[in-house]
Amino acid sequence: TDITCGYCHKLHEQMSDYNALGITVRYLAFPRQGLQSQAEQDMKAIWCAKDRNKALDDAMNGKGVQPASCSIDIAKHYTLGVQMGVNGTPAMVLSNGMVLPGYQGPKELKAFLDEHKKQTSGN
């Protein structure tokens, strides 16, 4: 995710809808503006916050980012994303490594995942 990405905000706002459909989303920091950008610094502060979930919620809701520091290396998040084939946000990586680029609404994603499961399980 990237806190400067409009569709990442939309996805985050709908997280309870994804979860209600049985979809679990785990976040990886992927600052689109690159490493050493303000977005990277802000995302590091979020990941270093005492309450990371609240810090991310606040940032996604436009409440700003409170300074925080720790030893987390956002470059590792970014590099992992690149290695998995992510080149923009939002992007979802399935458990089999398949990358779904772009925003997918909760119902659309559920339908895709159900069909993908059928195709990959042979049923």
Label the model's feature ranges:
Residues 3-5, 25-26, 71-72, 78-79:
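A short linear-motif detector with a strong N-terminal bias
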Residues 12-32:
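Conserved helix-turn-beta segment immediately C-terminal to the redox Cys motif
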Residues 118-123:
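Short, solvent-exposed mixed-charge patches
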Residues 34-110:
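Thiol/selenol-based redox catalytic cores and closely related redox-interacting motifs
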Residues 6, 31-35:
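Short, catalytically relevant binding-site loops at active-site mouths
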Residues 1-13:
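Conserved redox-active cysteine motifs that mediate thiol-disulfide chemistry
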